[in-house]
A protein has these predicted regions:
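N-terminal, positively charged regions that mediate nucleic acid binding
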Residues: 1-57, 222, 226
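Solvent-exposed alpha-helices and their adjacent loops that cap or buttress functional pockets
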Residues: 7-11, 21-24, 30-33, 52-55, ...
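Structured core elements
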Residues: 16-18, 30-32, 39-41, 61, ...
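Conserved mixed alpha/beta catalytic, RNA-binding, or beta-rich assembly cores of soluble enzyme
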Residues: 114-144
């Protein structure tokens, strides 16, 4: 299949991560997957949710949103509608679940870390970019409060799919919109699965195709883990 940006089927978009993008946040990163750009801010609070107050542990959570002009046409802010959409809630729960797999919460007793992921420009893969960039922001925040030992694993995510019967890595919006199936895969740096979200949009896909998609994602995630490590080391 001919990809509009001339990428090979197994090639990531150009990916960059700028750490410490926001001087106010304990940890932050601006992540770019091609034309998808997301700001991830990690804020540390010396408190835990009420339901955790009797437990010797900490908490990591996430919020997600898209700026009004992050897409082709302006969207109304969800705050003006009075509630978040089901899509937004689903995505921020996914991000939170994924990032909690990066840390040992028992080493964060008394702390809550909130990762805010704000999409400033969207071209597919905003949730996977949020997880990958959010991990760097979380790591930088833990360095700031000298809790780096709480990190268990780096976590990253990528999308894969089938378009015109061909497997593709890191779908942009056009590819995602026309995919027969698309799958979001979250792994840790040991290449263990954390979460898989997959849908046969136009047709069902086989177990063999699913395995091939996971293998394709794994190869892309290896590159993302390498990038995360470089950014954390040199940032």
């Amino acid at each position: 299949m001919h990809r509009l940006d001339k990428r090979k089927y197994n090639q990531l978009r150009e990916v960059s991560i700028i750490p410490d993008y926001n001087k106010h946040a304990e940890g932050s990163a601006l992540i770019k997957f091609g034309d998808t750009h997301v700001i991830c801010n990690a804020s540390v609070e010396k408190a835990v949710p009420r339901w955790m107050q009797d437990k010797k542990t900490g908490w990591v959570t996430a919020e997600y949103g898209m700026l009004p002009r992050s897409t082709n046409e302006r969207m109304n802010r969800e705050a003006n509608r009075g509630k978040q959409s089901g899509r937004t809630m689903e995505i921020q729960r996914l991000i939170g679940r994924s990032l909690r797999q990066a840390v040992d919460l028992d080493k964060l007793t008394g702390y809550t870390i909130t990762i805010d992921c704000d999409v400033i420009q969207a071209d597919g893969g905003t949730r996977t970019a949020s997880i990958t960039g959010g991990t760097v922001a979380l790591y930088k925040a833990l360095q700031k409060i000298e809790k780096e030992d709480a990190i268990k694993n780096l976590v990253a995510a990528i999308s894969v799919g089938i378009c015109k019967d061909e497997l593709l890595l890191d779908l942009d919006y056009e590819e995602d919109s026309n995919a027969q199936c698309d799958v979001n895969i979250v792994m840790n740096e040991a290449l263990e699965l954390i979460e898989v979200q997959g849908t046969g949009e136009e047709k069902a896909f086989s177990k063999e195709q699913f395995k091939d998609l996971v293998d394709l994602a794994e190869n892309g995630l290896k590159d993302l883990f390498t990038l995360q490590k470089e950014v954390i080391k040199n940032g």
